[in-house]
Amino acid sequence: MEKRDFKEQLKKTAHLARLYLTPEEEELYAKQLQDILDYFKKLQEVDTSNIEPMAHVLSLSNIWREDEPKGSISQEEAFKNAPEIENLGFKIPRIIKREE
């Protein structure tokens, strides 16, 4: 099976997610990704020609109540305790700084 090096992709994804990975974690996660890919390749080799297709593996039934529209609070009521409103929305402080 084809082996891929996932380290660079992991570094890029971790950077975008603002995660710090140690070199040991990078090695571990790269190996785990390769193992997952290898497993999917094994699954592709399984002969399913005599298997009847299913929409879902479990029988699904809705055990919950029916959704019914109900009244809601007014926009004024929703905004009355908001510290700041901007463009008909709640304004909150920025929590992620952009890197230039």
From Swiss-Prot:
GO molecular function: asparaginyl-tRNA synthase (glutamine-hydrolyzing) activity; ATP binding; glutaminyl-tRNA synthase (glutamine-hydrolyzing) activity
Top EC class, one word: ligase
Disulfide bond positions: none
EC number(s) reported in the record: 6.3.5.-
Alphabetic keyword roster: ATP-binding, Ligase, Nucleotide-binding, Protein biosynthesis
InterPro entries linked: Asp/Glu-ADT_sf_sub_c, GatC
Keyword match Amino-acid biosynthesis: no
A GO BP entry: glutaminyl-tRNAGln biosynthesis via transamidation
Keyword ATP-binding: yes
Record's function text: Allows the formation of correctly charged Asn-tRNA(Asn) or Gln-tRNA(Gln) through the transamidation of misacylated Asp-tRNA(Asn) or Glu-tRNA(Gln) in organisms which lack either or both of asparaginyl-tRNA or glutaminyl-tRNA synthetases. The reaction takes place in the presence of glutamine and ATP through an activated phospho-Asp-tRNA(Asn) or phospho-Glu-tRNA(Gln).
HAMAP family in UniProt: GatC
Membership in a protein family: Belongs to the GatC family.
Protein name as annotated: Aspartyl/glutamyl-tRNA(Asn/Gln) amidotransferase subunit C
Organism in which the protein naturally occurs: Dictyoglomus turgidum (strain DSM 6724 / Z-1310)
Top-level taxonomy: Bacteria, Pseudomonadati, Dictyoglomota, Dictyoglomia, Dictyoglomales
Gene (name only): gatC
